Swiss-Prot record:
Belongs to the influenza viruses nucleoprotein family. Late in virus-infected cells, may be cleaved from a 56-kDa protein to a 53-kDa protein by a cellular caspase. This cleavage might be a marker for the onset of apoptosis in infected cells or have a specific function in virus host interaction. Keywords: Capsid protein, Helical capsid protein, Host nucleus, Host-virus interaction, Ribonucleoprotein, RNA-binding, Viral nucleoprotein, Viral penetration into host nucleus, Virion, Virus entry into host cell. A motif (Unconventional nuclear localization signal) lies at residues 1-18. It is found in: Virion; Host nucleus. GO terms for biological process: symbiont entry into host cell; viral penetration into host nucleus. This is Nucleoprotein. Homomultimerizes to form the nucleocapsid. May bind host exportin-1/XPO1. Binds to viral genomic RNA. Protein-RNA contacts are mediated by a combination of electrostatic interactions between positively charged residues and the phosphate backbone and planar interactions between aromatic side chains and bases. InterPro entries: Flu_NP (IPR002141). It comes from Influenza A virus (strain A/Shanghai/6/1990 H3N2). GO terms for molecular function: RNA binding; structural molecule activity. It comes from the Viruses. Encapsidates the negative strand viral RNA, protecting it from nucleases. The encapsidated genomic RNA is termed the ribonucleoprotein (RNP) and serves as template for transcription and replication. The RNP needs to be localized in the host nucleus to start an infectious cycle, but is too large to diffuse through the nuclear pore complex. NP comprises at least 2 nuclear localization signals that are responsible for the active RNP import into the nucleus through cellular importin alpha/beta pathway.
Amino acid sequence: MASQGTKRSYEQMETDGERQNATEIRASVGKMIDGIGRFYIQMCTELKLSDYEGRLIQNSLTVERMVLSAFDERRNRYLEEHPSAGKDPKKTGGPIYKRVGGRWMRELVLYDKEEIRRIWRQANNGDDATRGLTHMMIWHSNLNDTTYQRTRALVRTGMDPRMCSLMQGSTLPRRSGAAGAAVKGIGTMVMELIRMIKRGINDRNFWRGENGRKTRIAYERMCNILKGKFQTAAQRAMMDQVRESRNPGNAEIEDLIFSARSALILRGSVAHKSCLPACVYGPAVSSGYDFEKEGYSLVGIDPFKLLQNSQVYSLIRPNENPAHKSQLVWMACHSAAFEDLRLLSFIRGTKVSPRGKLSTRGVQIASNENMDNMESSTLELRSRYWAIRTRSGGNTNQQRASAGQISVQPTFSVQRNLPFEKSTVMAAFTGNTEGRTSDMRAEIIRMMEGAKPEEVSFRGRGVFELSDEKATNPIVPSFDMSNEGSYFFGDNAEEYDN
């Protein structure tokens, strides 16, 4: 990517950005992981969880959600000001699952947010440790990306549901900072901007007054974040147009949707990080592993090694397939919801199937679900190889892809060609090239027309044996190109509902 030199690496975003060398970054990320681990150990003690119960991913999710809620300033303020019946704004909680008399029972716990904040700060040497909180948000976001297809949200903003490969991070809260912005897909940014513009169209005062000035600053910042993700001059110029508009309206929405479509072929740069559940970090810390001393990276071998040696369990509903549940969580752990399934199968060493073929619902259990027939099983989160996570979209080229998802967003920096359905994508670009962005549109369409199927992305990059910690011997995988490469293929995954 051309501008790589001017950007901060995401470890720097993760660490408040003073330019640090690799060792300092690894130590700093390690410190963040230590804090999450220590917090989780303490919460398991508070909740009186057995070792097995502490390694249950559903319990991990509840504990993570409690601390995120405890630190959600804006929502907490809102709840104080708009009290709703039966909800104590000062408390947070959720379902905790325990093994009682040979079966799983659900217990609803409630804690003071103040108490949770105290435990979190204590585990993080007195700091608020916002980076650790963001890390958990990204893990939840990656899990949502793998579990749900955002068809409805896409359609509501006037986008095509087949653009789901652009929607990474679409459920990340606004407060997720620079690290959160780095992992958001092109479609996610476009959707946030369209929502904003629509509010401006419907509400005369949206851009006016002191609040409007803040809104305008946020709008321009989001435009700049999106611009920074595009890799071609024409796409960036188009973002300048959208940003500089005096009174953003339908023309800007058109331009944004156009640029999102173009990203199916001219892919943007989106960061990928392996963020694991707290119940992985906790046991590692309690076994005496010192992440800060050893150093840790979210984009290298470390998360793979950690998962090789972790035991994580999950509740399984009566007609779910534990192997499928494992695949769902494995993909979430590596931020790989929109990666090519053929590459994922190669790295994982077992076949990775499209979402619609998986007999599993989401990981979280709803409060009205019956616990009587719940079983639990071990999640298989190990891998055959490891690969470096990418923050670039790779070169852009074409190959047969599917009806449901018509492009991929690469997660791993591994040589291959990136599939997309060129005829389908290009069909959306008939006609409309008039207006003030016509020259950019023409240029973008020309580049898309020129994208070639035989072009290889990430040339020379490969996967590595797990024993090859220094990444010295890349293994370039070979694929059966006739196979289906998209995860949300003609899909019936559940919708994500807030």
